[in-house]
Design a protein with these regions (language model features):
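Claisen-condensing/thiolase-fold acyl-transfer catalytic domains that form or cleave C-C bonds
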Residues: 1-43, 47-50, 119-241
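Flexible glycine-/small-residue-enriched beta->alpha junction loops
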Residues: 42-90
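Short alpha-helical interface patches
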Residues: 104, 111-115, 143-149
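N-terminal leader/propeptide and maturation segments of large enzyme subunits in energy/redox metabolism
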Residues: 73-113
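Short glycine-/acidic-enriched loop or helix-start segments at secondary-structure transitions
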Residues: 53-54, 111, 207-208
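Short, contiguous, pocket-lining structural segments
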Residues: 71-78, 89-92, 96, 127-132, ...
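Short, charged N-terminal helix-start/capping segments
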Residues: 63-77, 109-134
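Flexible, active-site-proximal loop/turn residues at the rims of small-molecule/cofactor binding pockets
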Residues: 48, 103, 110-114, 199-202
Length: 241
């Protein structure tokens, strides 16, 4: 991280704040500093390089250290547990998963989808992410300063930050209350949504998040820049923004 800061080249030396998690969390912390009047410009950046190791296994170390992590369920297996739960409750179908995979661009047709063998039952390879190395950066500026930097700044009019527990025993795998609460606090339901960028690593998560946010499962237009096609740890969330 120090080498990254050197590469950015802040001269003269300025305040730098290092946070963990996705770059979207760094953006939220930056927004808070703007509200406090501590800064009027900021560079927010994040990057990830999962290629040297097995990311789906590394993520298992974040689970409950006593009851879950020693069993080494990888990220694919946990997503599969969630998918099986939703399928058996008949809240989603294999057709929904296939449609989402086509929308994400991991597969071209339903026939091709159903021809794939199970990868992490009941998920197929097209349901799961392909990990990629990458980075993202964006510049934030306060009102008054932003107009000096560009002719047409995009404004943050609502923002909220929430998280669900990672303990399986205290959460419902068929709901995302943190997302619903964050959407409410950010004012999502106060107006029509023209464009929605979702950071979802699996088709089952994409479907569930759309339901929680009351977004259509099959929108008229869909971006092929989907994180399932290229999931970059710590950068994919900020990239959506």
């Amino acid at each position: 991280f120090v080498m990254t800061l050197d590469a950015v080249g802040p001269v003269p030396p300025i305040s730098e704040s290092h946070v963990e998690m996705d770059g979207a969390w760094a953006l939220y912390e930056t927004w808070v500093k703007f509200q406090m009047g501590l800064i009027d410009t900021a560079l927010v950046y994040s990057y990830g390089k999962p290629s040297p190791g097995s990311l789906q296994d590394v993520l298992s170390t974040q689970l409950d250290p006593y009851y879950v992590a020693p069993l080494w369920p990888d990220a694919h297996a946990i997503a599969a547990l969630q998918a099986r739960h939703l399928l058996e409750k008949e809240e989603i179908s294999f057709e929904d998963l296939a449609d989402c995979a086509i929308r994400a661009g991991t597969i071209d047709s339903k026939e091709e989808y159903f021809d794939q063998p199970m990868f992490a039952d009941p998920l197929r390879r097209a349901d799961c992410p392909t990990y990629a190395d990458g980075g993202v950066a964006m510049i934030l500026a306060a009102e008054g300063k932003a107009e000096e930097l560009c002719d047409r700044p995009a404004w943050i009019t609502g923002i909220d930050h929430r998280i669900d527990s990672h303990h399986f025993g205290v959460r419902n795998l068929s709901a995302i209350p943190s997302a619903k609460k964050a959407a409410l606090n950010a004012g999502l339901h106060q107006t029509d949504v023209d464009l929605a960028e979702l950071h979802t690593s699996y088709t089952v998560q994409d479907i569930l998040l759309r339901k929680e946010l009351n977004l259509p499962l099959n929108p008229e237009k869909s971006s092929k820049n989907h994180p399932i096609k290229a999931e970059t740890l710590m950068a994919s969330g900020l990239l959506r923004i």
